[in-house]
Amino acid sequence: MEPRGLLALTVLAAASAGELEADGGWKTDHSEQMVGKGPCNVEVRDSLTYSEFVHRYAYSKPVIIRGITQNEQFRALCSKQSLLQEFGNRLVRLSTANTYSYQKVDVPFKEYVEHMMKPQSLDSLGSDTFYFFGDNNFTEWDSLFRTYVQPPYQLPGTTGAYSFGIAGAGTGVPFHWHGAGYSEVIYGRKRWFLYPPEKTPEFHPNKTTLSWMFDTYPYLTEVDKPMECTIHPGEVLYFPDRWWHATLNIDTSVFISTFLG
């Protein structure tokens, strides 16, 4: 058996025996958690048929679906120990945490995890903050991505494209929009803020979501407040095409999105 296969079996055996830590080794000190999970006004469903998905949510509003994917194997392979052992010396591309993410830098994955991935500070600009999300090398990381089970409901005429990331507490991407997609957290918690296409949120594209949380969010009137919710492992958030959204990682988080295009 190839070493890669042996690694996967070892990790899965540890997980099944209950030896894998609940956070996968992606620990977050309580002092690093600057925000809580907040309220949730996004509809949460424990079960959903494809017909319901298409007619009630696909083109009109976000929804959180529980238990829609079974990703125990992918989750086990995303533990800190497993990813560092398998991909530690591989280069990953970091992007700035601002709306347009213009700047990129390539570093070894181990260097990012052990030295660069830190909690977000309030005085840092998004344009000066690099973190790992998207721009994935699907060839070098194929042994991981081929184990992921994407949400089963797709829009007619679309296919799914993955965006995988790992980031420290307090990090996130400020408001932006693109096509429809899903977001799933593998470890940690991710807080989402959403506005419909016709309602442009008040934000600065080079400031972080964390600074927006402290400088703008508390002063929003009821009519200007976003839809929001925090997603946990085992939950998938669907967002329709062109919906504004910003994200904030409450903990050190491992996450994957599936963009439908």
Labelled PLM ranges:
Residues E2-V236, W244-G261:
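N-terminal accessory scaffold of Fe(II)-dependent oxygenases
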